[in-house]
């Protein structure tokens, strides 16, 4: 279940399933059942208020309320609007509800131990205001538990944006597949625990819809990993050139360590001659070369991948060097100063991209490079990737990776420990190392983000950037052993 569906794709999955012979009211009953199952798994019987909106999300609420009442729970049900105005499957399930129906209001939250939010689904298109906003505020300030159905009311399912105000849930139960808004900020913060439950929509139906966005997971990229064979040697595993600055040497040293731990066969740090003693003393396995040898280095096709930017410095010299590297059409990772150096002329950078390239901006760098690209993070990453013909990775708690052809992945990892100096340099090194080993740019970016986050999750509080590369071998071993079992 790692595909991510837009709201329109989810509507299409529902439609195809109904056309295939599964009645809509059965899908709604199934939805009510899986939410009921999640509720009784998390809570014992208590006073619950089920808050229903005027659409299918409200119909789910009637199904949930009936199941809870049948199990002896004390249930109050509030409805937005008149029950006579409900249509289709929602009206069918409302007719099966034998309890009282109250007007939707903040009073329903008072005295409740649990609130089930079925007010609005993922397709909400307008800001919540007025009395409904007061209701949401009351829910969020109440000590009761909160379950949201589909998405927390007020969250845009496609973008994660909060439309006015939004319910802050302890548990969100969605159906079939997650939506972008479950993983993109700030919506992700409103969801609490996310449960994705099957309601009878087949995998074949999802395949036919052809999603182009996924939760970043090894299933997405594991087939693209180039594991070394017994007959291989270090030159088969790539030779990465990491370009380092003369003063902020720590950044490129982190790049180098991460790239080598990712499995690259050889690594050379290229820097001003004055800085080479620092780089040479950092790790005996690192090779070094002076910047004066640039032409000879890049004319050697065995040097098949480049990382430039971390600690390198911003300016015309950096711009010129990046353009020369891009002209070679080899695997290239551009980060930090390599991106900022083009802030005044981003079109030159985009025009120069020809080979497999990954751009790894954080939000500030992205805004400087693409000031005219607005919208949610997923939309912006896709637009920038298409414009530049490169894989674009916008870093953050909800990292998004997008390819020029529109494919995208969202990181669902919860790893606040990555907010530390140097972690971005490590990520650039991991991605560069994977590309040097032959992985395509989109897969390398996705795998790099996953390894980076998984390492941080395993290490936990107290993490510093230097810790991340040292944890990579254990994770890579897990992936390798899993690949052997599948073979």
Give the ranges of each region predicted by the language model.
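A general alpha-helical scaffold signature found inside nucleotide-binding enzyme cores
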Residues: 92, 130, 134, 376-379, ...
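Core alpha/beta nucleotide-donor-binding catalytic domains of modification enzymes
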Residues: 87-94
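Contiguous, small/hydrophobic- and glycine-enriched helical/loop subdomains that border
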Residues: 97
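Internal gly/pro-rich beta-alpha loop/helix module
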Residues: 112-114, 119-211
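Tryptophan-rich substrate-binding surfaces of secreted polymer-degrading and adhesive proteins
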Residues: 80-84, 100-101
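Short strand->helix junction
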Residues: 83, 121-126, 156, 162, ...
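Short acidic low-complexity segments
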Residues: 100-111, 290-299
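Small-residue (G/A/S/T)-rich helix-start motifs and N-terminal tracts that mark the onset
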Residues: 1-80, 87, 171, 182-333, ...
């Amino acid at each position: 279940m790692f595909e991510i569906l837009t709201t329109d794709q989810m509507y299409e999955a529902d439609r195809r399933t109904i056309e295939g012979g599964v009645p809509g009211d059965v899908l709604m009953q199934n939805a009510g059942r899986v939410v009921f199952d999640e509720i009784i798994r998390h809570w014992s019987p208590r006073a619950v208020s089920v808050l229903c909106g005027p659409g299918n999300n409200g119909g789910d609420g009637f199904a949930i309320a009936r199941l809870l009442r049948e199990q002896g729970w004390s249930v109050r049900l509030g409805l937005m609007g008149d029950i006579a105005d409900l249509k289709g499957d929602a009206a069918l399930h409302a007719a099966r509800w034998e309890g009282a129906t109250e007007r939707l209001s903040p009073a329903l939250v008072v005295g409740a131990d649990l609130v089930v939010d079925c007010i609005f689904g993922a397709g909400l298109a307008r800001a919540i205001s007025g009395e409904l906003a007061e209701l949401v505020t009351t829910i969020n300030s109440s000590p009761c538990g909160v379950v949201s159905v589909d998405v927390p009311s007020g969250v845009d399912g496609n973008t994660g944006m909060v439309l006015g105000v939004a319910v802050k849930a302890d548990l969100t139960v969605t159906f079939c597949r997650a939506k972008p808004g479950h993983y993109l900020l700030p919506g992700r913060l409103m969801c609490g625990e996310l449960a994705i439950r099957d309601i009878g929509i087949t995998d074949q139906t999802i395949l036919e819809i052809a999603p182009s966005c996924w939760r970043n997971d090894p299933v997405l990229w594991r087939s693209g990993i180039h594991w070394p064979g017994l007959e291989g040697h270090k030159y088969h595993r790539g030779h990465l050139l990491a370009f380092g600055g003369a003063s902020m040497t720590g950044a490129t040293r982190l790049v180098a360590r991460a790239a080598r731990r990712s499995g690259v066969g050889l690594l050379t740090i290229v820097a001003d001659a004055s800085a080479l003693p620092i780089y040479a003393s950092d790790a005996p396995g690192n090779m070094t070369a002076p910047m004066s040898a640039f032409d000879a280095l890049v004319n050697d096709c065995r040097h098949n991948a480049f990382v430039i930017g971390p600690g390198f410095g911003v300016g015309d010299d950096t711009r010129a060097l990046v353009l020369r590297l891009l002209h070679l059409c080899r695997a290239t990772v551009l980060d930090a100063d390599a991106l900022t150096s083009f802030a005044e002329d981003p079109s030159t950078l985009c025009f120069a991209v020809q080979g497999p390239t990954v751009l790894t901006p954080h939000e500030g760098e992205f805004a400087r490079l693409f000031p005219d690209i607005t919208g949610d993070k997923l939309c912006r990453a896709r637009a920038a990737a298409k414009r530049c013909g490169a894989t674009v990775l916008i870093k953050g708690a909800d990292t998004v990776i997008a390819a020029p052809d529109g494919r995208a992945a969202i990181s669902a990892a919860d790893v606040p420990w990555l907010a530390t100096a140097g972690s971005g340099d490590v990520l650039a090194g991991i991605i560069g190392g994977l590309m040097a080993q032959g992985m395509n740019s989109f897969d390398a970016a996705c795998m790099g983000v996953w390894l980076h986050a998984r390492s941080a999750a395993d290490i936990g509080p107290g993490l510093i950037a230097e810790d991340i590369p040292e944890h990579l071998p254990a994770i890579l071993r897990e992936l390798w052993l899993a690949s052997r079992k599948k073979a």
